[in-house]
């Protein structure tokens, strides 16, 4: 079953100079029980898409889409209150820099118990409070925190970033969401803690059937854990498909450049040889190129690239390029 089905999502920011199109006609789908990766450089629009899904963008943003379906229901056509009710019930999101997302004036116990729904808990107010405490302890155990008493009695500043992120995950799964969105959840964490968190989300997917949208700018980190992968560049979807296929046979020059820039994907690279890197840097929103936004940096760019390429399909592999790699085979 398809949980999330977005077609041609466009996000525009109102500025004093006019509208700036930060996300340009991006399509994204997520099946039940699937882990989908969303990868791209900083500034590619990954977090904006996540915030659009959970409806937390402010009034300066304009959201347009041909389709924005959650379990067959078009969220953009619903009243805001009903939209928020559905999102609050079915979708949860964890952010980067978790210690800044937690309330510094409240203990972890207070914040975690507040995130636990009271529906279905037996007894009066006092009894429900005890049930919430027990469930909070169970949630901490589920995310790998054994010293629950010390963590529950602590304030966020007293905990490490890794423990705070585990607390955020516990708060997110307290209501058993159908979709968990993880927006760069391992930023500034140690490598061992990163692996722990990725394994945790993988186990939640396997044991609970929870779908996960995993957002990162580190291709090697999420490639191991995702079933399908979408690659963004400067607000445009450049490639999408099964993770193994995208990594083995990239059709877009940007995806190919990402893969070549990761040492783990280049086992035959001679020692001390520089990794491949595209020239230049990602453009600012105020100075976006016309047509394909990779054009000024692309080694395969030609005059046709001043026109925005359409999203093409080769079996279950999607790409957006006038001159894809392996051009003859893909035609």
Protein language model features and the residues they cover:
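Hydrophobic anchor residue at the start of the ABC signature
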Residues: 169, 180, 193, 197
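A short, proline-enriched helix->beta-strand linker immediately N-terminal to the Walker B motif
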Residues: 174-178
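Charged, flexible cofactor/metal-binding loops and thiol motifs
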Residues: 242-331
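P-loop NTP-binding/switch modules centered on Walker-like glycine-rich loops
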Residues: 41, 185, 189-270
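Conserved ABC transporter NBD signature motif
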Residues: 62-74
